[in-house]
Amino acid sequence: MYPSGGVMLGLLAALQVAVQGTGAMPCQPGFTENEYNVMTADVITEGQVLLKVDFVDCGRGSGLRFESGDPADFRIDADGTVMAARTLQLTDRKGQSLEIKAKDENSQEQWMVHINFTQPKQVPVILFPRHSVLVKGDDSVNRVKRDWVIPPVNVLENSRKQFPEELVKIQSDKDKSNTLRYSVTGPGADQNPTGLFIIDPISGLLSVTKPLDREHIPNFHLRAHAVDINGNQMENPIDIIINVIDMNDNRPEFTHQIWNGTVDEGAKPGTFVMTVTSQDKDDPNTANGMLRYKILSQTPESPSSNMFTINNKTGKIITVAAGLDREKVPQYTLIIQATDMEGNPTYGLSNTATAVIRLLDVNDNAPEFTRETFHGEVPENRVNVIVTNLTVTDKDEPGTPAWNAVYRIISGDPTGRFSIPTDPVTNEGLVTVVKPVDFEMNRSFMLTVVADNEVPLASGIHRTRQSTATVSIRVIDVNESPNFDPNPKQIKLEEGLPQWSMLTTFTAHDPDRYMQQTISYSKLYDPANWLEIDPNNGRISTIAVLDRESPYVKNNLYNATFMASDNGVPRASGTGTLQIYLLDINDNAPRVFPQEAEVCERPEPNAINITAVDGDLNPNAGPYAFELPNRPSDIRRNWTLTRISGDHAQLSLKISYLESGIYELPISITDSGNLPMSNTTYLRIKVCQCDHHGDCVDMERIMAAGLGTGAIIAILICIIILLVLVLMFVMWMKRRDKERQAKQLLIDPEDDVRDNILKYDEEGGGEEDQDYDLSQLQQPDTLEPDMIKPVGIRRLDERPMHSEPNYPIRSAAPHPGDIGEFIHEGLKAADTDPTAPPYDSLLVFDYEGSGSTAGSLSSLHSSSSGGDQDYDYLNDWGPRFRKLADMYGGNDD
């Protein structure tokens, strides 16, 4: 069986001891053995005890010390116990021996002994546990498992031996009587990662096939099985734990390659700065993963090369020396090294990182003015104007509270007219006017200013004196605006003040006392246009009657604004407000509200509540007196008016029934003012039929019956406009028809006689004489005798139809287009027509000059003589033509 961990092999008892020298001799200090031989496994774990050497000190006491010849791999205690300082593989060492030295600190004597290491040639054997059989009294048999702890198998990671490497041999005591087959299962065997461990099924040798990596898998849990050739289980499976022993195969790794830290300048020694950390993938419980830190270098090495130190276990960096000054060295750079194997420089692996330490500024430098005196100037009455800039120097870091300057005025400005804010970029002091300065009061200022920082000086920093400066400010005179005093000015007047009444004098004074300027006045704002101001002396008078009830008066106040201007260069002006408080007078008569109301035909359901409204205030308003007029008499007979209060009255029907309709009811109201005013207001009342709720049900009929005068006028105007539009449309249609008919006349240009057509006055005849078809003038050949005058068109004075003499029909014009000839023939026919009007009148025509192509028209003096005509038909025309018949148709008597 193979023990592991910190347990010694049982073979230590077989150490060979060679004792040199014989015989009894005096006490000689030294080791009891000249050489020690130790048989151990190839892999020795950290802390594993190998042996204990014996030394005879001969009473030398505590002055004796043991030393290991290879302290990196082995260490020895004061009692002589030798153990491994780290996990190692003996075959990897240069030698298989170790030298132990004993030294007397007092006499400086030394003694040495060698320890030789050897490894067993056989692999450890792991046996399946045996079982005992316990027989009880009832003949029952119980199998009891013996308590057997199987030690784990240690395998060094990254082994360089030949593979497969035999680890242990698994064996059962039943293989003497049976042929057994061995196998293993679990991760690394038949599970991922498969094939790492294999077992010889006959001999039971368990081997590893390749190097192992503890950082990947630190241990394996396998199960060993033993079966016969038929597959029957011969032993219960046993657990085999394989631990991968760590080797120092990983360097420390810093979590950051560059570390940034800060510390105040002037910090005391021992001030914490920062902590750096690193990690090692090796086993942290062994020296392989135990790290130690140290500072390799510091840049710059000022004022000392060791301004900082680091805790080798925790990585905390602290200051170790005084003299950190940001103004001299603003930043330090440290190279930090982390080494495993507890910092062993020979066997340990190391890595480096950079630590950048920036010194934070503290206020160890006070601001200093660049000059002792600063100059500036400012116009009077100006605010928020920068007069001058104050400059300082400060060696502290810009932009920090230790650098930012704060300026204060300690003298020369008792009224606080100036302030000095700081420019955040340039750190300059901006001397600014915050209250207006007056040239007439102060022509110059002399300020004393001090400068400090936002934070006080650091402790231990002292300065001899505080930096101060003088600021000389000159005030520039400017033309100032005239000022009204008081502004606003209030006066109290009664309303109704007549036109051209003098109200008050509103004047302004000029602040520029040394300029001797003239002030003129003008009106700037007068919404009701009631006032005027004298431009020379500022006297204000009325140009209209003041009315308190005007919409421009708010809360009895009327505001007007006036302007005063001087004659300076440039001109300056100021404004002032005049507030007139108007006292009420009784200048408004009361009136009824509402102006319209509804009431039922019968008095029971409801009544009308009326209110008196007056634009005046008390005592020129209520209480009011309400009264109905005596005339006409039916008003008091039909209605009754009852006063409810000083401002209200109730109107109701006095009779049992009043016909529905709209009534204009006069109501007289008198106010209570001194010299009271009365007014008669007409209340428009709509009397209607009501339902049982007292609501009107025939309001639409009443509204139709009560159409107002304005509505009637509007309706009439609309009707007139509509008629005019219709008439204009008809006239336009007739004119268009006439133009269309005129275009149908085809006139031969050679026979056109339009330039000779003369207009004659016509006396007699009617519209029907001109009613002819123009188309017939163009086609006279188609005229028929019975179509010359249409049937049904007759004159009222035309003679009755009877047999008449036949006249020859006019021949058609030789050419349809010869309108002139057609007209001549028409005239001839008219001359011979006895029915043509006038029958008994002498037609006299004005002389129109010679050369007329129309010739003479027919008349009573025509070429035909009376003797050639037969006038007997006149007797048939009736009594109206009796006289004419006697003149022409009678006999000689």
Swiss-Prot record:
Sugar-bearing residue positions: N260, N312, N389, N442, N559, N609, N638, N679
Q: What is this protein called?
A: Cadherin-2
Q: Which residues lie on this side of the membrane: Cytoplasmic?
A: 733-893
Q: Which Pfam families does the UniProt entry name for this protein?
A: CADH_Y-type_LIR (PF01049), Cadherin (PF00028), Cadherin_pro (PF08758)
Residues that make up the propeptide removed upon maturation: 25-146
Q: Where in the cell is it found?
A: Cell membrane; Cell membrane, Sarcolemma; Cell junction; Cell surface
Q: What is the effect of changing R160E?
A: Does not display significant adhesive activity alone but mediates cell adhesion with pcdh19
